Each structure stands twice: as structure tokens, then as C-alpha cells.
């Protein structure tokens, strides 16, 4: 360290901070009569590329993505009950949440290859893949 400064990140991109993000949501609701209501919504989330490691490793960043979600529901107009189908990440985007190098992986690679350094191993944790759920609410 020089003058107590361990790492100077001046001008560097912050980890986990995309340059742009957007969210668009559309909601629709309609009274069907006979005490029934139908509603639906669609949401779109976008993100530009961002780093998922604190050391800003370009080998394991998250590229830009667009993620879609939707919901449709049918229920009573008094809110007593509601049946919904909910979908998230409908286009099944693979979104890295966090990642980095695997500790000691370089050492194991060296040992397995007879001493030659073949590279660095990376791992990542991903957000949930496409999922669709059915939900029933009943208020007593």
C-alpha cells in the first residue's frame, strides 16, 4: 500500500452497476359482471452489461438482457378469492447474479495436467430460470 491506499478504482466502473436499466409495466383490469373480475399485467425489465465481481473481471460479467414477466388473474369483485397464473423470466434469460474465480482451481488444474497452467476456472450463481406458477388466494 502507498499512503494507506490499497486499491485505486478512480474512473473504474462499479461492480453490480449497469449503466442503464429500464422497467415497463402494463396493467389491465375488467369487470366481467356476475361478481367476477379479470386482470392481467405484463412487465419488461432491461439491463445493460455489468460486472458481477468486485475485481471487475471481464471474463465473468453479465451481458445486457431483457426479461419478461406476465400475470393473468380471475377473481371475485369483492376480493374474497382470486386464481392467478404468473410467469417470470418467460424468455428464459440466463442472468448471472454473482460469480468469480474458484479458489484453488488453478492449483488443481496444474496438478491434474502435470504442472502446466491451463487457465482459471470460474463459477457463477444465476437468477431463477423461466418459471410459471399457479396461485389461489382466499380471504376469510
Enumerate the language-model features and the residues they cover.
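C-terminal extracellular loops and terminal segments
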Residues: 1-69, 126-128
Amino acid at each position: 500500500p502507498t499512503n494507506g491506499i490499497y486499491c485505486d478504482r478512480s474512473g473504474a466502473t462499479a461492480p453490480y452497476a449497469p449503466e442503464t436499466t429500464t422497467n415497463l409495466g402494463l396493467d389491465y383490469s375488467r369487470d366481467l359482471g356476475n361478481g367476477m373480475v379479470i386482470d392481467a399485467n405484463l412487465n419488461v425489465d432491461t439491463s445493460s452489461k455489468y460486472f458481477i465481481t468486485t475485481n471487475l473481471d471481464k471474463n465473468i460479467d453479465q451481458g445486457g438482457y431483457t426479461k419478461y414477466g406476465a400475470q393473468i388473474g380471475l377473481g371475485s369483485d369483492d376480493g374474497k378469492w382470486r386464481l392467478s397464473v404468473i410467469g417470470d423470466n418467460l424468455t428464459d434469460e440466463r442472468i448471472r447474479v454473482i460469480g468469480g474465480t474458484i479458489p484453488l482451481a488453478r492449483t488443481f488444474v496444474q496438478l491434474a495436467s502435470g504442472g502446466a497452467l491451463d487457465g482459471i476456472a470460474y463459477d457463477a450463481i444465476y437468477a431463477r430460470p423461466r418459471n410459471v406458477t399457479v396461485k389461489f388466494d382466499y380471504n376469510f
